Amino acid sequence: MCLTRYDEKFFDCRKSQIIAYLDSQQVPVIPLFYNSYQSTAEIYRQIFIENKSKWKYSEPSFSDDDLLRKGIRPVRASFPDFSQASDCLKDLLARHKLVFVWGDEYCLPYRKEAFQAIHSTHSLVVTGYDGENKAYYVEDWDGLYGYLPAVHLEAAFDSLSRQMRTLLVLELNDEEMRENKQEDTDLFRKWLQAFEDDYIFYDRVLLDMRDYEENRLISMDHGLRLIAASRHVFSKFLHYIDDAPEEVGLLIRNHQLANHIAAIVRRYIIAKQIDWDGAACKIRQLREQEDDFMRKLKSRYG
C-alpha cells in the first residue's frame, strides 16, 4: 500500500492519513466532508489570536461519531511507553493492520526541519515490521516511504505526553458501510443552520496588513490557504449531495481567489514588493464572494 494525499492539505496530518487510508479501501469519504467549510472567524481566532500554524488548525470533521455512522470503528490503545506498546504494534502488523502512531518530530530523522530542533506532534502510518533489522515500515508523505529504525520510533513515541502515546486502528464493517444520502443531507442542513461567520478575518487583515511584520504575514498566508483548501474540500460534498453547479462554481472561484491572494502574500514575504491597493481590492472581492456564497447556500438548503 502507498497512501497518497487526497485533501489539498486542509486536514491535519492524522485526519488526512485517515482519509487517504479509507479512500484506498474504497470507503466513500466525501459524505464525511459535510462540516468541512470553516468560518473565517474561527480561522482568525486560531491562526492570529492563538498563533497556530495551518498544520495545527483544529476543526470538527471526522469525529468518532461520524466514523461510526459510516461503519468505521476507531480502536485505540494507550500505553505508558513504547516498550509496552511494541508487542501490540507488532501483533497488529502481523495481522496486516495499518496502525496510526503519534510521534515527536524532534526524534524523527526524516523530518529534516524539525529533527533535533523542534518538538512537535506528528502522525505516522506504520504498515510493517522487519524483525531482523528492527525497523518499522512507515508511510508518511511528509518525508518517508520506507523503513524507520525502531529506536527512532520508540524515542518519538516516548517523547510525547502520556495521553498521546496511543495506537489507532480503524475496523471497517462492510455491512454497515452504506451510502445514505438523505442522512448525510440532513446532517449538512443541521450544520448549515448553526453556521455563522462575521468575516472578521478579511476585516482585520484589511485594517492591519500594511503594518504586519513577517510573522503576521505568515499567519495571513496560512489563513488564506486554510480558507482555500476548506472551500475546495467542501465543494466535493456539495457536488455529492446535489450536483449544485452554481454553488460549487462559486466555491471553486473563492478557492482560487484565496489561493491567489496567498501567493501574493508569499511573494511579498520573499521579495518585499507588493501592490497593497491591488491586494486589498482582491480581499474585498473575496469577502463579498464568500458572503454571496453563504447567502445562496442558506437560501437553497437552510
UniProtKB/Swiss-Prot annotation:
Transferase is among the record's keywords:
yes
Q: So which domain of life are we looking at? A: Bacteria
InterPro entries in UniProt:
BtrH_N
Q: What does the record give as EC number? A: 2.3.2.19
Biological process (GO), any one: antibiotic biosynthetic process
The protein's annotated pathway: Antibiotic biosynthesis; butirosin biosynthesis
Give the UniProt keywords, A-Z.
Acyltransferase, Antibiotic biosynthesis, Transferase
Q: Does the keyword Acyltransferase apply?
A: yes
Q: From the UniProt record, list the reaction(s) this protein catalyses.
A: 4-(gamma-L-glutamylamino)-(2S)-2-hydroxybutanoyl-[BtrI ACP] + ribostamycin = gamma-L-glutamyl-butirosin B + holo-[BtrI ACP] + H(+)
Note the Pfam families from the entry: BtrH_N
Which GO terms fall under molecular function for this chain's record?
aminoacyltransferase activity
Function of the molecule: Aminoglycoside acyltransferase that attaches the (S)-4-amino-2-hydroxybutyrate (AHBA) side chain from the acyl carrier protein BtrI to the aminoglycoside ribostamycin in the biosynthetic pathway of butirosin. The AHBA side chain protects the antibiotic from several common resistance mechanisms.
Q: What is the protein name stated in its UniProt record?
A: Ribostamycin:4-(gamma-L-glutamylamino)-(S)-2-hydroxybutanoyl-[BtrI acyl-carrier protein] 4-(gamma-L-glutamylamino)-(S)-2-hydroxybutanoate transferase
Q: Which organism is it from?
A: Niallia circulans
Q: Which gene codes for it? A: btrH
